[in-house]
């Protein structure tokens, strides 16, 4: 574990693991333009930081109260989805990533450049993303993908270095003791959390 890192901060690395798997799967490189929908969640906050460290131009889609957080994490542009239609930002992207499973390829396709890819971390509303990802695989178009997390050699050391140098920050919203795990779950279900919610087993 990185020097000076608390155990609760180390736990949030799970979001970074999945975010990294997505970025590796889409082959994000320096200069690519990426829009991350749901950039304030566990996966999204990690993805903004990792994408920026790859040299990509990052647009984060968040609610009003998370705009400053998105910029703090390194996003080049932050869009408030509560006050404007994020699909009408006036730019096109190499990649659009849904980090919370609440949008679809059909809703976002006009944001994509020719040959652009829509990646989802969830099946999406009514399972649309899963069906489209399957079709993309069959046709080899790769326009819609749902990357499966897999072990990537060296990632732990990479993230450790980033955290020790202050280039990756663990974003923790709330902490609950194990006895209040039901309350934690209810809070997560509100869709209002930022970063990750931690269950502190040792507190009991």
Language model features with spans:
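Terminal peptide-recognition signature
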Residues: 51, 70, 96, 108, ...
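Glycine-rich phosphate-binding loop and adjacent beta-alpha segment
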Residues: 102-165, 201-204
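C-terminal hydrophobic helical "lid"/dimerization subdomain
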Residues: 152-204
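N-terminal Rossmann-like NAD(P) cofactor-binding module of classical short-chain dehydrogenase/reductase
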Residues: 79, 94-97, 119
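A short acidic, Gly/Pro-enriched loop at the edge of an enzyme's catalytic core
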Residues: 87-95
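Short acidic-hydrophobic, aromatic-tinged amphipathic segments that line or gate anion-handling sites
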Residues: 77-82, 176-179
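Mid-domain Rossmann-like dinucleotide-binding core that forms the NAD(H)/NADP(H) cofactor-binding site
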Residues: 6-80
């Amino acid at each position: 574990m990185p020097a000076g890192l608390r155990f609760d901060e180390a736990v949030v690395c799970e979001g970074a693991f999945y975010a990294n798997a997505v970025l590796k799967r889409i082959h994000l490189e320096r200069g690519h333009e990426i829009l991350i929908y749901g950039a304030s969640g566990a996966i999204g906050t990690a993805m903004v930081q990792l994408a920026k460290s790859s040299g990509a131009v990052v647009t984060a889609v968040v609610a009003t109260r998370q705009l400053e957080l998105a910029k703090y994490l390194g996003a080049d542009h932050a869009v408030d989805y509560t006050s404007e239609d994020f699909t009408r930002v006036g730019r096109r992207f190499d990649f659009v990533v849904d980090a919370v499973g609440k949008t679809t390829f059909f809703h976002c396709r006009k944001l994509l450049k020719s040959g652009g890819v829509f990646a989802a971390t969830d099946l999406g509303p009514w399972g649309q993303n899963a069906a489209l990802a399957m079709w993309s695989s069959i046709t080899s178009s790769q326009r819609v993908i749902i990357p499966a997390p897999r072990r990537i050699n060296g990632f732990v050391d990479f993230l450790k270095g980033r955290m020790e140098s202050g280039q990756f920050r663990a974003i923790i919203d709330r902490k609950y003791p194990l006895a209040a795990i039901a309350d934690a779950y209810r809070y997560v279900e509100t869709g209002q959390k930022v970063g990750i919610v931690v269950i502190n087993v040792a507190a009991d």
